[in-house]
Each structure stands twice: as structure tokens, then as C-alpha cells.
């Protein structure tokens, strides 16, 4: 058998092993060295066992895969060639690692004899992602003296680790030339495959039968005591299914419930980022005996300040065993899904122990409406965000100023799926991630990002052409990085090195990539054009042009005024 044919046989085993662990999507960047992997992934697509996607920019491709992984909760494979193509995946690998989303990187490589000798496009790729992957496999160059069962077991073991912990797997796969003109008939019939033939022909069969570790959460030994006390519940980022029941549980206990925009939990005390600026309410909330936090990645600065200031009993509930303790609390940790925790901690019905947050939250609702006004701007879009969403769809929110405005000013419908990249909270790959969420879900998806974020990920506008159902990408154009208007930096330095003001508009970008584009000026105009956008196939870019400091100034003004409100 020729080298090119055995390369394909070797690659076939790799991609078929991934199928057994839920991989249904292969995201592929162009490249020659990865040809064996690419062609075998395409074979799976032809057999209707997987879908293949392509993109010319590995950085965007990584985030596109991340978006699919977020919405499907399945592992997604990424195939790239050797060299800097691999390195361009790093930002997406970091984000996926921090949020436990499942990516499997298949990086093709030069064979060992071409590393460290000046060969073209050959860099050391083993361990290139440092400690971010939860499993790393550095395969040898394909050779028949390796047992086929060994290759299957090696790939499956990495997938088993991922299935238990989430996160990223990196499989580095060297291939020697020639890479082309394989004998298609011989790929599937090589004697080397005989020991694994029954495994290969049955996609449901796993080589390693691993039993999942069962770790049921138990009721805290002092729960009967703590459920009679004064409590505060803080809900960070959670999957939709885990948030169900938290609101009713909190209301039964009579405890204050503070929810993050990523929680998918209906807020009975919305606008917490605003009303917690009031020191009187902040201090009274600190009188709680216990705080229970579900999930992490809290957006609100003032909610985080409350958590930092609280010195009482602190419980952290999260399905992963990560160390989530930025404020060094003396804490009790429950490695459990939120709804499993609720099931074994029955509430005791009590009257609310603190009414001021509810009163101030209700006041904020009317006050924010009054201050935001009827103009179409970033603050009003954040406050009325539910008016631009599809009934059954997804919301993807970018980083920087807008996610803070949404967290502070809006009240989302209970259980509406919200996606973000708040692991490392970077602005890279946001368009690509939104495209992945839309593609992976097949549901109408609204993405909202800032202008600098859009400029940072312009290549990924190309990915929007892969979406055939109605989706909306809002670009909030405040002519620069308005988030930095919040910083106490000298004006000239802020302008030149933080804000980076510009006069760019996004209509030419939409034209270049063949994407529908609208630029509304009023809410009536926006609603009329959105109705048309939701009635046609594909993505529409909506550019909202706003004055550069309006959003940040309103945000600061709301915080200041509520902080000074007199509380009886």
C-alpha cells in the first residue's frame, strides 16, 4: 500500500473514532498537509454521518466551531494544516477551555524528520496550546507496525476525558508525503484494519466502554438551619435547562434573587447593576446570613462588588470542579448542576426578609424607561432588546459596553437562550461565534456587537453567507471603543490609545460579502425593516449609528442618580 493510501486509512480511523463521541460537525480550513483528514471527514458527510464546514481564516473557524459547540453541547472537530494555521486557533481554544465547551483540534503536522531542520511550514506543534487542552495526543507518523486498536484506543481515551470534563482536546497528526492520489478502493480494505473491522462498520460501537462516574449531590448537613436564615441567591451563566426552578425556589425561601443576563432565569429583581449602586440597599443586602451563587462569569461590576464585600456563609454551585473564587471566600462548593442541587435542598416557605431591593428595582424600571427615552440608540436597544428577538430563537451578545448595558437595563424572557464569550471576555471572533450559534441551532439568531469588535472580526462576515435562515447581526457603531469612556484616563491618551475613534461605516462591508444591510434611524423604521428581514432567508446586518459617548454617559448617569436615591 502506498504512503498516500495508508495516510487515508489512518485518518479514517481517527475521524470514525470521533463519531462515537458525538462529533457531528467538522470545521475545515484549507491546507495541503491536512488532506487525509479533510477527505475522510468529507467521506463522513457523503455518508450523511456528519456535516463539514469551511472557512479561509483559522481564527474565525475556531470561533465558528465554538458557536456550534455552545448551541449543540456536542464536541466539534476542527481540521487545520501545519504551521501558524494551528496557532491561529489559540484564542478560540482559550475561550472554549474556560467555558468547558467541547472542541477537538485535529492539527496536521510535518513528520518528525522535518521538524527542527528548516523545512517549510514546520513548527513544533506538540503542546502548542500549553495547559488549555484537557487532553493532548501527539500521534506518530502513520505506520503499519502500530496496532490499529492502539490508534482507536488513544483517540477514544482523549474523548472520554473530554466527555467527563468538557473543554478542548488537541490531536496532532503528522503525515508524510505523498498526500494525494490514494487508491480509494484500498483505503477501506487494508489488512491493518482487520482487528478493528467490527468496530469500524458499526458507528455505535466504542472500543473503550467507560462507565461515567456517578456523583450525586447530597443535601448539606445544615440545610435545615440555613434555609430558615436570610439569604441572597446570585445566578451567573447557566444553561437554560439548569435555570428552571431557581426563581420559584428563591421566592419560596423569601430570599433575594439577583440574576446575570447569561443566567436564562427570569429576574424578579431586574436592573441589579443599577440599584446595587445605592449604598443603603447594598449595605442592607450585606446583612444576609448566606449567599448561594449558581454558575460564574458575572458581568455586573456592582454585583461583583457585593460578592466581594460579603463575609458570611458562601456556597458555590457549578457543574464543573473549576476553582471559582475570585474574592477568596471561605466557601462550601457543590460540584453539581443547579437543578440537581435544588432537588435535594427543598425550600422552607418564608416571607421576604428584605423589601428595599424590590422597591428600588421597581422604581428603576420606570426611571430607566424615562431616561432612555424613545430614540433609537444603544441604551434603548439594550433596554428593549426583547422587541428585536424572534419568538423562538437565540441571542448572542458581544463584549465591552453593550453586554453591560443589556445586563443593567433589560429584563429578558424566562428561558430565552443567551450566548456570550465571557470565558476570557475578548472581542475576537464574535461574528464567527454568532454564525456558529446560528448554524448549529438552525434557529433565528440575533447577534449584537460593537463596531471595534466587528472590525476585529471582519473576515468572519464571510461565514454569515453559510446561514440560510433569518438571522440579524446588529453592529452598534459609536465610532470607537466606548467602553473606555468609563475609564479615568486623560482625554488625549484615551482617544489615541484606548478609544481609537474612526469614521468607518459597515454598508460597504455588507456589499462586499453579499449580505443584506439596513441602517434604521428610528424605532418605527427598525421594526418595519426587521419584519422584512425576518421574512427572508439569510443574515441581515443592522448598523445602529450612535453618538460616541451617549451610551456610556447614560449608564454613568443612571448609576449616579440611583446611588443618590433616598431609601426610607
From Swiss-Prot:
The gene coding this protein? menD
The record ties this protein, via SUPFAM superfamilies, to: Thiamin diphosphate-binding fold (THDP-binding) (SSF52518)
Question: Cofactor(s) for this protein?
Answer: Mg(2+); Mn(2+); thiamine diphosphate
Metabolic or biological pathway = Quinol/quinone metabolism; 1,4-dihydroxy-2-naphthoate biosynthesis; 1,4-dihydroxy-2-naphthoate from chorismate: step 2/7; Quinol/quinone metabolism; menaquinone biosynthesis
Details of cofactor binding = Binds 1 thiamine pyrophosphate per subunit.
Organism of this sequence: Actinobacillus pleuropneumoniae serotype 3 (strain JL03)
Q: Name one GO molecular function term.
A: manganese ion binding
The disulfide bonds in this chain are none
PANTHER family reported for this sequence? 2-SUCCINYL-5-ENOLPYRUVYL-6-HYDROXY-3-CYCLOHEXENE-1-CARBOXYLATE SYNTHASE (PTHR42916), PROTEIN PHYLLO, CHLOROPLASTIC (PTHR42916:SF1)
Protein name from the UniProt record: 2-succinyl-5-enolpyruvyl-6-hydroxy-3-cyclohexene-1-carboxylate synthase
Q: Please state which protein family the record places this protein in.
A: Belongs to the TPP enzyme family. MenD subfamily.
Question: What role is this protein assigned?
Answer: Catalyzes the thiamine diphosphate-dependent decarboxylation of 2-oxoglutarate and the subsequent addition of the resulting succinic semialdehyde-thiamine pyrophosphate anion to isochorismate to yield 2-succinyl-5-enolpyruvyl-6-hydroxy-3-cyclohexene-1-carboxylate (SEPHCHC).
Pfam families listed in its UniProt record: TPP_enzyme_C, TPP_enzyme_M_2, TPP_enzyme_N
The EC number(s) given in the record are 2.2.1.9
**Keywords carried by this UniProt record:** Magnesium, Manganese, Menaquinone biosynthesis, Metal-binding, Thiamine pyrophosphate, Transferase
Q: Where is the signal peptide?
A: none
SUBUNIT field = Homodimer.
UniProt xrefs under NCBIfam families: menD
- Protein's UniProt keywords contain Oxidoreductase: no
Q: Name one GO biological process term.
A: menaquinone biosynthetic process
Task: Spell out the reaction equation it catalyses.
Answer: isochorismate + 2-oxoglutarate + H(+) = 5-enolpyruvoyl-6-hydroxy-2-succinyl-cyclohex-3-ene-1-carboxylate + CO2
Q: What is the lineage of its organism?
A: Bacteria, Pseudomonadati, Pseudomonadota, Gammaproteobacteria, Pasteurellales
Amino acid at each position: 500500500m502506498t504512503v498516500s493510501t495508508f495516510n487515508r486509512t489512518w485518518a479514517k480511523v481517527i475521524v470514525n473514532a470521533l463519531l462515537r463521541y458525538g462529533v457531528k460537525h467538522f470545521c475545515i480550513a484549507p491546507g495541503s498537509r491536512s488532506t487525509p483528514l479533510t477527505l475522510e471527514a468529507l467521506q463522513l458527510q457523503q455518508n450523511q454521518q456528519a456535516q463539514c464546514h469551511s472557512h479561509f481564516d483559522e481564527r474565525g473557524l475556531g470561533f465558528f466551531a465554538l458557536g456550534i459547540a455552545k448551541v449543540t453541547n456536542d464536541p466539534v472537530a476542527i481540521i487545520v494544516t501545519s504551521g501558524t494555521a494551528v496557532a491561529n486557533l489559540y484564542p478560540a481554544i482559550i475561550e472554549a477551555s474556560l467555558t468547558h465547551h467541547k472542541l477537538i483540534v485535529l492539527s496536521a503536522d510535518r513528520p518528525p524528520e522535518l521538524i527542527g531542520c528548516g523545512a517549510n511550514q514546520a513548527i513544533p506543534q506538540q503542546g502548542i496550546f500549553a495547559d488549555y487542552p484537557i487532553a493532548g495526543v501527539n500521534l506518530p507518523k502513520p505506520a503499519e507496525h502500530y496496532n490499529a486498536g492502539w490508534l482507536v484506543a488513544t483517540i477514544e481515551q482523549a474523548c472520554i476525558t473530554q466527555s467527563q470534563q468538557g473543554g478542548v482536546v488537541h490531536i496532532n497528526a503528522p503525515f508524510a508525503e505523498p498526500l494525494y492520489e490514494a487508491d480509494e478502493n484500498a483505503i477501506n480494505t487494508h489488512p491493518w484494519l482487520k482487528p478493528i473491522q467490527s468496530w469500524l462498520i458499526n458507528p455505535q460501537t466504542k472500543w473503550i466502554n467507560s462507565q461515567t462516574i456517578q456523583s450525586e449531590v447530597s443535601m448539606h448537613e445544615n440545610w435545615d438551619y440555613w434555609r430558615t436564615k436570610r439569604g441572597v441567591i446570585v445566578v451567573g451563566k447557566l444553561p437554560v435547562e439548569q435555570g428552571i426552578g431557581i426563581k420559584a425556589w428563591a421566592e419560596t425561601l423569601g430570599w433575594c434573587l439577583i440574576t446575570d443576563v447569561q443566567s436564562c432565569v427570569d429576574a424578579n429583581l431586574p436592573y441589579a447593576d443599577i440599584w446595587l449602586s445605592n449604598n443603603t440597599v447594598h449595605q442592607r443586602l450585606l446583612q444576609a446570613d448566606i449567599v448561594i451563587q449558581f454558575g460564574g462569569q458575572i458581568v455586573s461590576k456592582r454585583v461583583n462588588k457585593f460578592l466581594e464585600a460579603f463575609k458570611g456563609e458562601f456556597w458555590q454551585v457549578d457543574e464543573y470542579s473549576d476553582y471559582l473564587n475570585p474574592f477568596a471566600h471561605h466557601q462550601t462548593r457543590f460540584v453539581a448542576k443547579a437543578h440537581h442541587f435544588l432537588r435535594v435542598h427543598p425550600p422552607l416557605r418564608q416571607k421576604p426578609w428584605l423589601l428595599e431591593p424590590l422597591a428600588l428595582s421597581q422604581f428603576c424600571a420606570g426611571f430607566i424607561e424615562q431616561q432612555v427615552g424613545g430614540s433609537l440608540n444603544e441604551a434603548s436597544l439594550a433596554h428593549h432588546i426583547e422587541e428585536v428577538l424572534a419568538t423562538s430563537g437565540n441571542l448572542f451578545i458581544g463584549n465591552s459596553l453593550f453586554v453591560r448595558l443589556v445586563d443593567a437595563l433589560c429584563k429578558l424572557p424566562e428561558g430565552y437562550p443567551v450566548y456570550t464569550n465571557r470565558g476570557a471576555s475578548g472581542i475576537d471572533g464574535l461574528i464567527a461565534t454568532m454564525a456558529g450559534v446560528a448554524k448549529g441551532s438552525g434557529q433565528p439568531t440575533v447577534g449584537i456587537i460593537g463596531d471595534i469588535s466587528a472590525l476585529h472580526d471582519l473576515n468572519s462576515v464571510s461565514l454569515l453567507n453559510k446561514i440560510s435562515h433569518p438571522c440579524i447581526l446588529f453592529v452598534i457603531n459609536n465610532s470607537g471603543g466606548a467602553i473606555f469612556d468609563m475609564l479615568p484616563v486623560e482625554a488625549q491618551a484615551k482617544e489615541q490609545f484606548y478609544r481609537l475613534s474612526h469614521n468607518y461605516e459597515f454598508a460597504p462591508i455588507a456589499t462586499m460579502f453579499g449580505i443584506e444591510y439596513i441602517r434604521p434611524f428610528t424605532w418605527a423604521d427598525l421594526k418595519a425593516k426587521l419584519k422584512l428581514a425576518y421574512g427572508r432567508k439569510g443574515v441581515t446586518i443592522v448598523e445602529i449609528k450612535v453618538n460616541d459617548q451617549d451610551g456610556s454617559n447614560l449608564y454613568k448617569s443612571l448609576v449616579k442618580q440611583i446611588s443618590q436615591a433616598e431609601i426610607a
